[in-house]
Amino acid sequence: MIQQETILQVADNSGVKKVMCVKVLGGSKKRYATLGDEIIVAVKEAQPAYGLRDGQGKKVHNKAVQRAVVVRTKKEVRRPDGTYIRFDDNAVAIIDDKGNPKGTRIFGPVARELRDKKYMKIISLAPEVL
């Protein structure tokens, strides 16, 4: 369960290391984000002089605001078959406005729930889908 002010790891090679959730997308009353949900994040830690570029062609720096999709959560998620899935960390992948990942690699496993939410590009880049 991800909510405002939650600090998350970034699971791609976009150059961003840590982000903070600013807003959970999906309606005014939506408080928590889970696997496959889109959130708005603020960059808290980025590799210096490296990483994604914003619309003006400048390097992304701390405090930059980006869109991201949740790929791993510590809180367990119940699947329709009755099993539960949980991970060791809370992680996101940075995406653009069309839902495509900005990085070219995904580190660590991602949840199968991303397939249901139509994030097939992230699924194909991930080394393991659980």
Swiss-Prot record:
SUPFAM superfamilies: Ribosomal protein L14. Gene3D superfamilies: Ribosomal protein L14 (2.40.150.20). GO terms for biological process: translation. Pfam families: Ribosomal_L14. GO terms for cellular component: cytosolic large ribosomal subunit. It comes from the Bacteria. The keyword Ribosomal protein applies. SMART domains: Ribosomal_L14. Binds to 23S rRNA. Forms part of two intersubunit bridges in the 70S ribosome. Part of the 50S ribosomal subunit. Forms a cluster with proteins L3 and L19. In the 70S ribosome, L14 and L19 interact and together make contacts with the 16S rRNA in bridges B5 and B8. Belongs to the universal ribosomal protein uL14 family. This is Large ribosomal subunit protein uL14. The lineage of its organism: Bacteria, Pseudomonadati, Spirochaetota, Spirochaetia, Leptospirales.
